[in-house]
Amino acid sequence: MSIEVNNESGVEVDEAGLVALSRYIFEQLYIHPQAELSILLVDEPAMEKLHIELMDEPGATDVLSVPMDDLTPGTPDRPTPQGMLGDIAICPQVAQVQAKNAGHALQDEMLLLTTHGILHLLGYDHAEPEEKEEMFGLQRELLTGFTGKEAPAETTQ
């Protein structure tokens, strides 16, 4: 699997941890081993620009997902086909504020946002209460399994 992290944010982030988490999620959700994912870490002005371009909403946000191929979680007998999962843009500056407000470390927030972004790439959403329950439940399960501790509270905007 190809997972690339490009840090243009100016904030020091444990990029290896984000890659390890992504690999864990790919394995848990039976994503094809040749699937590709790009994680871009950007500063607030760059995130605001992306937020306007992609969502037509002003202001920086925490995470944006841009799916490429229409991939969904697989099963043990039928993994996801090979393809480009997509791109995730994360703003560590916004994540720092959210982590502080939630009372957990920046790395915990970065792991939360990475998981959240990957789930969006796989078609999960949280617009409706049932969708939110399913997505956030899976998000907590994946984070707890990866870190071995209780997942941080959801802080996504």
Curated annotation (Swiss-Prot):
Question: What GO biological process, any one, is recorded here?
Answer: rRNA processing
The EC code for this enzyme is 3.1.-.-
Q: Which domain of life is it from?
A: Bacteria
Q: How is the cofactor bound?
A: Binds 1 zinc ion.
What are the recorded GO MF terms, alphabetically? metalloendopeptidase activity; RNA endonuclease activity; zinc ion binding
- Report the subcellular localization: Cytoplasm
| Gene Ontology annotations for the cellular component aspect, listed alphabetically | cytoplasm
Q: Which InterPro entries match?
A: MetalPrtase_cat_dom_sf_prd (IPR023091), YbeY (IPR002036), YbeY_CS (IPR020549)
Q: Which Gene3D superfamilies match?
A: Metalloproteases ('zincins'), catalytic domain
Q: Give a yes or no for keyword rRNA processing in this entry.
A: yes
- Residues holding Zn(2+): H116, H120, H126
Q: Which UniProt keywords apply?
A: Cytoplasm, Endonuclease, Hydrolase, Metal-binding, Nuclease, Ribosome biogenesis, rRNA processing, Zinc
- Where it mainly occurs, coarsely classed, is cytoplasm
Keyword Transferase applies: no
Required co-factor? Zn(2+)
Show the HAMAP family listed in the entry.
Answer: Endoribonucl_YbeY (MF_00009)
Q: What does this protein do?
A: Single strand-specific metallo-endoribonuclease involved in late-stage 70S ribosome quality control and in maturation of the 3' terminus of the 16S rRNA.
The Swiss-Prot or TrEMBL record describes its family as follows: Belongs to the endoribonuclease YbeY family.
The entry's protein name is Endoribonuclease YbeY
Its organism's taxonomic lineage begins at: Bacteria, Bacillati, Actinomycetota, Actinomycetes, Micrococcales
Q: Which gene encodes it?
A: ybeY
